[in-house]
Curated annotation (Swiss-Prot):
Protein name: Large ribosomal subunit protein uL10
Keywords from the named record: Ribonucleoprotein, Ribosomal protein, RNA-binding, rRNA-binding
Pfam family, one: Ribosomal_L10
Record function comment: Forms part of the ribosomal stalk, playing a central role in the interaction of the ribosome with GTP-bound translation factors.
Species name: Syntrophobacter fumaroxidans (strain DSM 10017 / MPOB)
Family recorded in the similarity comment: Belongs to the universal ribosomal protein uL10 family.
Keyword RNA-binding part of the UniProt annotation: yes
GO MF: large ribosomal subunit rRNA binding; structural constituent of ribosome
Quaternary structure and interacting proteins, as annotated: Part of the ribosomal stalk of the 50S ribosomal subunit. The N-terminus interacts with L11 and the large rRNA to form the base of the stalk. The C-terminus forms an elongated spine to which L12 dimers bind in a sequential fashion forming a multimeric L10(L12)X complex.
Entries under PANTHER family matching the protein: 39S RIBOSOMAL PROTEIN L10, MITOCHONDRIAL (PTHR11560)
NCBIfam families tied to this protein: PRK00099.1-1 (NF000955)
GO CC annotation, single: large ribosomal subunit
Entry keyword Nucleotidyltransferase: no
Protein origin, superkingdom: Bacteria
Length: 173
């Protein structure tokens, strides 16, 4: 690959990494072409890009991006899964692929500017989808004012009940 081509690859990868919500670094040593094609297909179906990269080019492309945290991990054979939407999707697909093919190893991940080790990437894969998390948060936030209104309305309701009981006693007497 000549210098101009390398510069083009670095520029394209840099742009992708800047837009990425998550980047997962994997070691693909031992995967056959068919297995790699299956993995790429599964990732592409969810709009996640999977690219084999030279470590030096990845090091250059990741400057001033969230994936810069991955630079110390760049050793051996590396490929990067770049997700643009829900950050858990690349981790979920790779973890699911790992159930049937243990040759693919998760090296690390970058979520924003935070470096995730392989265990943290696996934990990210266990998270529910973003929409579900937002729905749970909204439900929790909605429950707080509802509970507060119930508690606050309980005091006047009890006071009115006491007044009604006093009035009934006076009417009976």
């Amino acid at each position: 690959m000549n210098r101009a081509k390398k510069e083009q690859v670095v520029a394209e990868l840099h742009e992708k990494l800047q837009r990425a919500s998550a980047a997962i670094l994997t070691d693909f040593k031992g995967l056959t072409v068919a297995e790699m094609t299956d993995l790429r297909g599964a990732l592409a179906a969810e709009k996640v890009e999977y690219q084999v990269v030279k470590n030096t080019l990845m090091r250059l492309a990741s400057k001033d991006t969230g994936a810069e945290a991955l630079v110390p991990i760049l050793k051996g054979t590396c490929a990067v899964a770049i997700g643009y939407g829900d950050p858990s999707i690349p981790a979920k697909i790779i973890k699911k692929f790992n159930k049937t093919n243990e040759k693919l190893a998760i090296k690390a991940g970058a979520l924003g500017i935070r470096l995730l080790n392989s265990d943290q990437v696996a934990a990210l894969a266990e998270l529910p989808p973003r929409e579900e998390l937002l729905a749970k948060l909204l439900g929790t936030l909605n429950a707080l004012p509802t509970g507060l209104v119930t508690v606050l309305s309980g005091v006047p309701r009890a006071f009115v009940g006491v007044l009604a009981a006093i009035q009934r006693k006076r009417e009976e007497a």
